[in-house]
Each structure stands twice: as structure tokens, then as C-alpha cells.
Regions:
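Nucleotide-activated donor-binding/catalytic signature segment of Leloir-type glycosyltransferases, i.e.
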Residues: 89-112
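Short acidic alpha-helix that forms the nucleotide-activated donor recognition element
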Residues: 110-121, 141, 155, 159
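Conserved donor-binding/catalytic core segment of Leloir-type glycosyltransferases
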Residues: 38-55, 61-64, 78
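Aromatic "clamp/platform" in nucleotide-sugar-dependent glycosyltransferases that forms part
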Residues: 128
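Glycosyltransferase donor-sugar binding loop
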Residues: 75-90, 107-108
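Donor nucleotide-sugar binding/catalytic pocket of nucleotide-sugar-dependent glycosyltransferases
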Residues: 1-12, 16-32
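Conserved acidic donor-binding segment of nucleotide-sugar-dependent glycosyltransferases
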Residues: 164-173, 181-183
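Short hydrophobic beta-strand element within catalytic cores of glycosyltransferases
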Residues: 124, 145-149
Length: 184
């Protein structure tokens, strides 16, 4: 198993003795980059994720909408999608454009660009199904703040990291309140 929460679920569901299941965290190569520092002009909320529905882009988009409605305008969101991956993502991009939300669809990034983005952003990670949640580990490695869905994988992935905060998975209002604290 890759994580403790996966081990606990296997033990519980398969009724296997816990001592027979080992957690072997996969090796993850972190790139050297400058330590985290917030963008000077505005907050940047970064969501590196593919297009599957379980990544929960909808909750993030709703949080962005609520943030804008409260008058917070000095921010942008950066998504590693190009906006035409599937019907669901196309609909989200169209909605973001119609509501003039500052969500940039930048497409895939090199590892170097990815780590540079972590170093100047707040990671928002609303996904509700992951094994490890690699972006959590990557953002933590540069000292970036993390706003993550309150799921077992996320708690396991960030451990006792003091810059991690959690929101109920589909609670866009709570996420927007957490994001607002980073706005100037």
C-alpha cells in the first residue's frame, strides 16, 4: 500500500491482520526551486490536475465565483487544463468565461514550470479520490500553503504540515473563505 489510509481500508474491508499489510511510500523526486513566496500583485491559487470529475473542479469554480461576489478581485486561479479535454471541462471553462472569473487554463506544464508555480501560489486541491495526492507533497516541498479537501488521502499526504488547511469536500463557501484570507 502507498499510504496509511489505504492500509487501514484494506485491513478493514478484507479483514486482513494489520501486521500483514505494509505501507511503502513511493519515491517521489522533488525539484529544487526557490522557497515559497506569495506573488506581490495578487494571490494565485494553483490547481494542477487532469480532467476527471473526481478532481472536483466544480467546487473550486464555485468558490471562485463566491470570492468574486464578495468583492475580492486581486487574485487568479491557474488550472493545468487547456479547457477542451471533455464536455465537463468545456462547460466549466465556458462558465468561468461567462462569469468573468480569473481562471487561467494553461494546459500541461513541465516539471520545472510546475515547481516554479508552486513556489508562488497557494495550492488548492479539492479532489475527493486520490491514492497519494502528489501535488500535496510537491507543494509542501517548497513551503506553499495548501487548501485541500478533507479526505483521508489528503490528511495522510500532508501529515503535520502547518501550512495545510482542510475544507469539507463540496463546501465551496468554506473554500472561498479560506481563499479570501490570501487576498490583499
Amino acid at each position: 500500500m502507498q499510504t496509511n489510509w489505504m492500509k487501514e481500508e484494506i485491513v478493514r474491508q478484507c479483514k486482513i491482520p494489520a501486521e500483514r499489510v505494509q505501507v511503502k511510500f513511493p519515491p517521489v523526486e522533488m525539484l529544487k526551486t526557490d522557497p515559497w513566496q506569495m506573488e506581490e500583485e495578487h494571490a494565485v491559487f494553483f490547481f494542477p490536475a487532469g480532467p476527471p470529475a473526481y478532481k472536483n473542479h466544480r467546487t473550486f469554480l464555485k468558490a471562485c465565483e463566491l470570492l468574486k461576489k464578495r468583492g475580492c478581485t486581486d487574485w487568479e486561479a491557474v488550472w493545468t487544463l487547456n479547457g477542451d479535454e471533455n464536455d465537463g471541462i468545456r462547460a466549466l471553462k465556458k462558465e468561468a468565461e461567462e462569469k468573468t472569473l480569473p481562471i487561467r487554463f494553461v494546459g500541461m506544464m513541465s516539471r520545472e514550470d510546475l515547481f516554479a508555480q508552486y513556489a508562488r501560489s497557494v495550492l488548492v486541491f479539492p479532489s475527493y479520490i486520490e491514492t497519494i495526492g502528489l501535488p500535496l507533497l510537491e507543494a509542501r516541498s517548497v513551503g506553499a500553503p495548501i487548501l485541500a479537501a478533507d479526505c483521508l488521502y489528503a490528511r495522510d499526504g500532508v501529515g503535520d504540515y502547518e501550512k495545510a488547511e482542510f475544507f469539507e469536500t463540496f463546501n465551496a463557501k468554506k473554500l472561498s473563505e479560506m481563499m479570501e484570507r490570501f487576498c490583499r
